[in-house]
Amino acid sequence: MKILVVNCGSSSLKYQLIDMTSEEALAKGLVERIGIEGSILTQKVNGEKYIIEEPMKDHKKAIELVLQALVDKEHGVISDMSEIAAVGHRVVHGGEKYASSVLINDEVMKALEDCVKLAPLHNPPNIIGINACRELMPKTPMVAVFDTAFHQTLPDYAYMYPLPYELYEQNGIRKYGFHGTSHRYVSSVASEMMEKDLKDIKVITCHLGNGASLCAVKEGKSVETSMGFTPLAGLAMGTRCGDIDPAILLFMERELKMSPDEVDTVINKKSGVLGISGVSSDFRDIEGAAEEGNKRAKLALDVYHYTVRQTIGAYTAVLNGVDAIVFTAGLGENSAASREEILNGLEYLGIKIDAEKNKQRGKQIEISTEDSKVKVFVIPTDEELMIARDTKEITAK
């Protein structure tokens, strides 16, 4: 059984064709600059690149070219489109309606439209991608897999903001959380590595990329997470501010005479480690600058590591203890220095790190010592595989 996994952005599209017998990706691809000049599709099969450069006025044209690349006689991996058993779509926001992945039909599409106000940047391109696939592959079943779904198990006291209750009732203002597919995947892999049932362990998962969030997993369910109503909340990130005093936004508007759009740009695109360091939102650049003595770069890293460490401490309280901590995503998988700094100060939990193992980059490994009371893992995330598994399970019903 072969499943196509699609992740649509506003002007880009990522895809993988996964053979579910071996759970291996037969092809991986990226389409960039959809709807703008210089559109390009890059597909990788067994390390070989295949590139298509031609105008793509919209996502439908992009998906046409994806399908063309997959069946290409020389560079493709399937002989006919009928070999694609189903398509799994990443959808950022499922609101309160979806606590798990779902087979797409007209009713689901309407619900996704209703969620646009909750994710105005992300859901529209997700919807456009689904519609394009449905047009081009009308007989192929499609499944929506939501970033928010895993966190729908949060207890009400964890997701409710202390605002007038009507704002929740009438406008859906509450904590939703994101990166759910990643947190779900790495927590399940951690349980396999520990040879324990996920229901019997308490895990804190740290998805640390340009966007970053933590999740507390108890009995296999998300019970707390750091992102909120939007992916802006929680930790300091690459360009996002994370949790700050909300009155700062009023100060920016009233005293500094900034418009709501200007404030939005500052807190989403000019803050985080970029804002503090003035160097970059790329942690490799900031680490390099800090090593060369740039004080603001070092401060940016210190603030970042502190917010992650602080949140791990809080989630240990939420879980009443912790059995495993997992690092994943770009920084979590590749920066030994960041992992070390984050865990420095959590010795009271009985965490002991093996310095040699911690030097490993981007591979699945336990980095704690044998006598560490808390297991610490680095687990490369695989959201595409998780989407494919859900798609297989739902279309088999």
UniProtKB/Swiss-Prot annotation:
Q: Show the active-site residues.
A: D147
Q: Where in the cell is it found?
A: Cytoplasm
Q: Where is this site: Transition state stabilizer?
A: H179, R240
Q: Which reaction does it catalyse?
A: acetate + ATP = acetyl phosphate + ADP
Primary location = cytoplasm
An example of a Pfam family matching this protein is: Acetate_kinase
Q: Quick one: which residues bind ATP?
A: K14, H207, L208, G209, N210, G211, D282, F283, R284, G330, L331, G332, E333, N334
Subunit structure, per the record? Homodimer.
The family assignment reads: Belongs to the acetokinase family.
Give the protein name, as stated in the record.
Answer: Acetate kinase
Could you read off the lineage of the organism from its UniProt record?
A: Bacteria, Bacillati, Bacillota, Clostridia, Eubacteriales
